[in-house]
C-alpha cells in the first residue's frame, strides 16, 4: 500500500454510494494480507472517490502511548491534571490509524459534536475531526459522547483500493458505530467478520487450506 495524502474530493455519502464508492463502510482484511501492517485490520473508510481513498484503522493500539500522556505532550493538560481526567477519557485508547502522517491525530466521533469548517459528517452516526480543539473538548468533558483517537491514516492511490478488493485483499460491510466506539480492540476483527456473515474460525481454516 503506497502512502499518499487524503483525497481532496470528499464526496457526500449518498452520492458516493450511488457511484459505487465505499466511504462510510468498514474494510476488513482477509487472512493472508500481504502487508503485515494491515493484517487483521478493520478500517473505517472516511473518503473514497475517483481521487483515491482514505481510512482509519480502528482496532490497533498505538505503541506505548495513552490518552493522558498524549494530552500532556500536546500541552492540553498538565501532568498533575492527568489523574483528574474523566474516567472514560483517561482510559480512551490511542489507535494506530495507519502509516500515513502517523504523527497527526484524527478523531472519529458521534455527530453530537461539531466544529465549523473542521468536522466532516461521513454518515449519520460517525464524523471525523482532525483539529486540536476536539481534544481540548474531550479533555474538558465537553467533547462528543463517543470518540476514538487515531494517529495516522491509511491511503490509497486512484483505483488502488478497487484493485486490492478485486484481488480478495479486503471484505467490506456497513459500519456499526457501536463496533467502532465501544467494542474491545481485540474483538473488533471477529465482530466485523460476523457482521459480514463469516465465522472467523471457518475463514481461518479456509485460508490454511488455500
Curated annotation (Swiss-Prot):
GO cellular component entries: cytosol
InterPro entries: AlgH-like
Protein family per UniProt: Belongs to the UPF0301 (AlgH) family.
NCBIfam families membership: PRK00228.1-4
HAMAP family: UPF0301
UniProt protein name: UPF0301 protein M446_6268
Species annotation: Methylobacterium sp. (strain 4-46)
Amino acid at each position: 500500500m503506497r502512502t499518499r495524502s487524503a483525497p481532496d474530493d470528499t464526496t457526500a455519502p449518498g452520492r458516493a454510494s450511488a457511484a459505487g464508492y465505499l466511504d462510510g463502510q468498514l474494510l476488513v482484511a482477509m487472512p493472508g494480507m500481504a502487508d503485515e501492517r494491515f493484517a487483521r485490520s478493520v478500517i473505517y473508510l472516511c473518503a473514497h472517490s475517483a481521487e483515491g481513498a482514505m481510512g482509519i484503522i480502528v482496532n490497533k493500539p498505538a505503541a506505548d502511548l495513552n490518552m493522558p500522556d498524549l494530552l500532556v505532550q500536546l500541552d492540553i493538560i498538565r501532568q498533575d491534571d492527568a489523574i483528574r481526567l474523566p474516567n472514560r477519557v483517561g482510559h480512551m485508547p490511542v489507535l494506530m490509524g495507519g502509516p500515513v502522517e502517523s504523527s497527526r491525530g484524527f478523531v472519529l466521533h458521534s455527530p453530537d459534536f461539531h466544529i465549523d469548517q473542521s468536522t466532516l459528517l461521513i454518515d449519520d452516526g460517525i464524523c471525523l475531526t482532525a483539529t486540536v480543539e476536539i481534544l481540548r473538548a474531550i479533555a474538558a468533558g465537553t467533547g462528543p459522547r463517543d470518540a476514538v483517537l487515531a494517529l495516522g491514516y491509511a491511503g490509497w492511490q486512484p483505483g488502488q483500493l478497487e484493485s486490492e478488493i478485486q484481488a480478495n485483499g479486503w471484505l467490506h460491510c456497513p459500519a456499526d458505530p457501536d463496533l467502532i466506539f465501544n467494542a474491545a480492540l481485540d474483538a473488533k476483527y471477529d465482530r466485523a467478520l460476523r457482521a459480514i456473515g463469516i465465522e472467523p474460525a471457518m475463514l481461518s481454516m479456509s485460508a490454511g487450506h488455500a
